[in-house]
Swiss-Prot record:
Its EC number is 3.6.5.3. Residues 60-64 are annotated as: G2. GO terms for cellular component: cytoplasm. GTP binds at residues 19-26, 81-85, 136-139. This is Elongation factor Tu. Keywords: Cytoplasm, Elongation factor, GTP-binding, Hydrolase, Magnesium, Metal-binding, Nucleotide-binding, Protein biosynthesis. Residues 19-26 are annotated as: G1. It catalyses: GTP + H2O = GDP + phosphate + H(+). InterPro entries: EF-Tu_GTP-bd, EF-Tu_GTPase, EFTu-like_2, EFTU_2, G_TR_CS, P-loop_NTPase, Small_GTP-bd, T_Tr_GTP-bd_dom. GTP hydrolase that promotes the GTP-dependent binding of aminoacyl-tRNA to the A-site of ribosomes during protein biosynthesis. It comes from Phytoplasma mali (strain AT). Residues 81-84 are annotated as: G3.
């Protein structure tokens, strides 16, 4: 853990880049840090530092979500770079669930593509209410009319998924040119729009502490660190938490708190933190569990839910499903197989239906009434739901 202290002298906002594979999300993230590093407001992160894994480097695509930190004159931003490849959408869901607002990156050269649409849908499902659009690769397009058509297409898409497409700000630029230092105007404009268009988030600090575990690391001689974004509440060093879901519930004492390699005296809703846990070994905690105030939450495996099943046009199923259908259910940072039971008077569920479902999961998950989830099958999102009542 670090010896530097994190200063809370600016509003902290979580943002991130979403969009189709190869449209420039990671290049844009790298360009933002490079430009702000010249003003002392960020640490310059190269493309290779953001796309970290061997497979990412070999394939030139982002697989895992990556966090970087930067500041403007007005705010401190935690920025998640989300994978755009269809195979890694579950990691994108985890990243998007941590954002207060999203930057949708669309290549002006290619226009709207399948993951553009899916990411906009998922952003809405995980509770993002505002997007900013960065039209990238504008330097490759000679006709102004083409860029205008792409912008109209994206605005229509945003309206379709209940974002305000007419008022959403669009910024044009080239992330690659900005990274090369030849055209930084688009990036400066984007940062200006982030500061102005995205309101200061209202943090849910009064409710009991809850943090979904996104990653787990070991610090030799110190203990195990759980990383994630605090969903609600506050926590201090020496307080006790419960580790809930997937396995037997365990208790642990917090011995350290850190955000972007700087120490915290407390963590609160909205913070991206590492929490050092005393007496917990690496194999006793995993991604998909949650840390919570003792007694505030339990793990369950059967519940009643209200769901919307996507139409074929929205990228969902082409056909109906029946009782005992077994898709994947995505909660916060985990996915679990479960089976569906339809209510007695319902014979089948069609794409486009809103309906009540009884869901039974293979493993217990920390849930309560109001917990949101996505339903996926065969690499695509087929529905979105909310837990309405716990059964067992």
């Amino acid at each position: 853990m670090s010896s530097k202290v994190f200063l809370r002298d600016k509003v902290h906002v979580n943002v991130g880049t979403i969009g189709h594979v190869d449209h420039g999300k990671t290049t844009l993230t790298a360009a933002i840090t490079k430009i702000l590093s010249t003003k002392g407001l960020a640490e310059n992160k190269s493309y290779d530092q953001i796309d970290k894994t061997k497979e990412e480097k070999e394939r030139g695509i982002t697989i895992n979500t990556t966090h970087v930190s930067y500041e403007t004159e007005k705010r401190h931003y935690a920025h998640v770079d989300c994978p755009g490849h269809a195979d890694y959408v579950k990691n994108m869901i985890t990243g998007a669930a941590q954002m207060d607002a999203g930057i949708l990156v669309v290549s002006a050269y290619h226009g709207v593509m399948p993951q553009t649409r899916e990411h906009v849908l998922l952003a809405g499902q995980v509770g993002i209410s505002k997007l900013i659009v960065f039209l990238n690769k504008c330097d490759l397009v000679k006709e102004e009319e083409w860029i205008h058509l792409v912008e109209m297409e994206v605005r229509e898409l945003l309206n379709e998924y209940k974002f305000d497409g007419d008022k959403t700000p669009f910024v044009r630029g080239s992330a690659l040119k900005a990274l090369e230092g030849t055209d930084v105007e688009g990036i400066n404009k984007l940062l200006e729009v982030l500061d102005e268009y995205i309101e200061d988030p209202i943090r849910d600090v009064e409710k009991p502490f809850l943090m979904p575990v996104e990653g787990v690391h070991t610090i030799t001689g110190r203990g195990t660190v759980a990383t994630g974004r605090v969903e609600r509440g506050k926590i201090k060093i020496s307080e006790e938490v419960e580790i809930i879901g997937l396995k037997e519930t365990k208790k642990a004492i917090i011995t350290g708190l850190e955000m972007f390699k700087k120490e915290l005296d407390f963590a609160q809703a909205g913070d991206n933190v590492g929490i050092l846990l005393r007496g917990i070994t690496r194999d006793q905690i995993e991604r998909g569990q949650v840390l919570a105030k003792p007694g505030s939450l339990n793990a369950y495996h059967k519940f009643l839910s209200q769901v919307y099943i996507l139409t074929q046009q929205e990228g969902g199923r082409h056909t109906a499903f029946f009782s005992n259908y077994r898709p994947q259910f995505y909660f916060r940072t985990t996915d679990v197989t479960g089976f569906i039971k339809l209510k007695k008077d319902v014979k089948m569920v069609l794409p486009g239906d809103r309906t009540e479902l009884i869901v039974e999961l293979n493993h217990p998950i920390a849930i309560e009434a109001g917990t949101k989830f996505s339903i996926r099958e065969g690499g695509r999102t087929i529905g979105a739901g909310t837990v309405t009542e716990i059964i067992e």
